[in-house]
Amino acid sequence: MEANYIVVRFGELTTKGKNRKLFTQKLLKNTKEILFEFPQLQYQLQYDRLYIYLNGANHLLVNEKLKTVFGIHSFSNAYKFEKDLDVVKDAIAKMINEDSKTTFKINTKRSDKTFPKKSQDINREIAGHVFHHVDRQLKVDVHHPEMLVTVEIRHDAIYVMTNIIKGAGGYPVGIGGKALLMLSGGIDSPVAGYLTLKRGVDIECVHFAAPPYTNEFAREKVFDLVDKLRHYTHGQITVHVVNFTKLQLAVYDHCDESYAMTVMRRMMYRIGEKLAIKNHCLALVNGESIGQVASQTLDSMNVINQVISIPVLRPVLCLDKLEIIDIAQKIDTYDISIRPHEDCCTIFTPKAPATKPKSYKAEAFEVTFDYETYVNECVENVETIVVDANYKNDEDIF
């Protein structure tokens, strides 16, 4: 059976007090943008629910899109019937018969107290009808049913909702401002971007390329990752590609090998901060996880952080690698991230990088060359590209 409409529940948004309207309006806007392929949909925003009227749209296709909307706690497919219990019983039996689940529960709510039958009596009557009209073995499970059917008897009609479908959770994207994601092409940074979006912070991305040491396949890999992330936002993400080759070679020419990674990261942060401020981003975001590599010890993070004044968000900071991989597989970025194309951080990896660097030593290496000119040149020559649904057809990207 095709559903008539979808009931969307907000979750964390219910705790937002006076800001509640701002959050729900943002969620409505984001939902409309993600469901733009279904122009026939109509929306009704109420205090604690969003009703989406399908008007013939396939509810299964809409369901898949709704699963990517941050700020949605859960949703249910719903059906509207005239106030004829026999019609409702037949419809529910058909729904359960079309499903493969073996346990179910009927939960009736009556806002129309003039309806002649009580909720418990309706539950028993519908369940009995289901047992007589479904051609497989079924059981009622009132505690943990595989299929929950909610029947709401209102003054205008009877409404039936099937299983509660889990939403993406979090807050509506954009409600928390915007940050600049340092996207390398590895496993961790796309996950960091996803988790940032989940907390309502919109993102732009910066990628550091080092041609000819990094190739067009590494570039394609990054844009494919962005294409996955854009499905969790308003359909497009801006990417800033920095040509890092000259500055990276200068770092390795003027620094002891053990400090090259530390100084290189400091240069990236300087460039990232300038791009963030220029593009109205309030923070940097990266995929650093404590102790994972030499540049991600607390000592290293402290020395690297000192060169900028804006915050650095590290959403995967305390996650194990396997936990990060689980999320990457869930959001479909893992297979892209493990493509064998190196980024600028891996092609020049020193054999014995400092794990407890000192800021005065990093500064001593930096004063031996005019790094500010290189940094400014990187910012001035940045390549900015918007990744949207048509990016694969954009010859300027590849």
PLM features: what roles do these ranges have?
Residues 1-180, 190-238, 242, 306, ...:
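RNA-binding accessory domains that recognize and position tRNA/RNA substrates
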Residues 186:
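Conserved G/P- and acidic residue-centered "switch" motifs that form tight phosphate/ATP-binding loops
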Residues 332-340:
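A short alpha-helix-loop-beta-strand transition element characteristic
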Residues 125, 129-130, 137, 164, ...:
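Active-site adenylate/phosphate-handling loop in enzymes that bind or generate adenylated species
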Residues 292, 340-348:
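Small/polar glycine-rich anion-binding or flexible loop at a beta-alpha turn
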Residues 230-256, 260:
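S-adenosyl-L-methionine
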Residues 11, 163, 206-208, 242-245, ...:
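Generic beta-strand/beta-sheet core signal
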